[in-house]
Design a protein with these regions (language model features):
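Surface-exposed helix-capping loop/turn segments at secondary-structure junctions
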Residues: 2, 27-35, 95-98, 132-139
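Short, histidine-centered active-site or binding-site loop motifs used for metal coordination
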Residues: 8, 64-68, 106
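Long, well-structured alpha-helical subdomains associated
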Residues: 111-114, 118-119, 125-144
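Active-site oxyanion-binding pockets that recognize sulfate/phosphate
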Residues: 6-10, 72, 76, 111
């Protein structure tokens, strides 16, 4: 069971929370743990990243940037970044990614972008976005 809180200035907070829940349930259909998920929409993330995720199996904190290097992200780009970070949330909640360990093996120094946890997140972000964006936002956007 996921308890989702959306913080920061973002339109359609209830829809964003529903979107998060749908993505997480798709990634972890058998999850029975109670997990608090806090999603913060911030002006920008450290190192100009589009998003960041950290936490443990009981609480996940996700930051989503509204801009990077002075350029604003579209709402859709923010939701794709959110999908990417929700994959990392799944990895943390299930114990696949745990501090300096990936699936129980120590993480050696390697390029983060080619790490298995990033490759999984990049491979799923657009699929998850396409699967849940219209369902979660079409009516909200039409009537805003």
């Amino acid at each position: 069971m996921f308890f989702i809180e959306i913080l920061g200035k973002v339109k359609h907070k209830d829809n964003v929370a529903n979107f998060c829940e749908n993505v997480l349930l798709d990634l972890m259909p058998k999850n029975r743990k109670e997990v608090d998920v806090v999603v913060k929409f911030v002006t920008q993330c450290d190192d100009q990243e589009s998003g960041y995720c950290y936490g443990d199996q009981e609480e996940i904190i996700i930051s989503i940037a509204k801009k990077s290097l002075g350029e604003a992200y579209s709402f859709e780009e923010q939701m794709i970044a959110l999908c990417h970070e929700l994959v990392h949330a799944k990895q943390i909640i299930t114990g696949e990614l745990d501090g300096n360990y990936w699936k129980g093996e120590p993480i050696t120094s390697r390029s983060v972008l080619t790490s298995p946890w990033e490759l999984e997140a990049f491979s799923l972000e657009k699929t998850l976005f396409e699967k849940f964006y219209k369902v979660s936002f079409d009516s909200a956007i039409l009537f805003s």
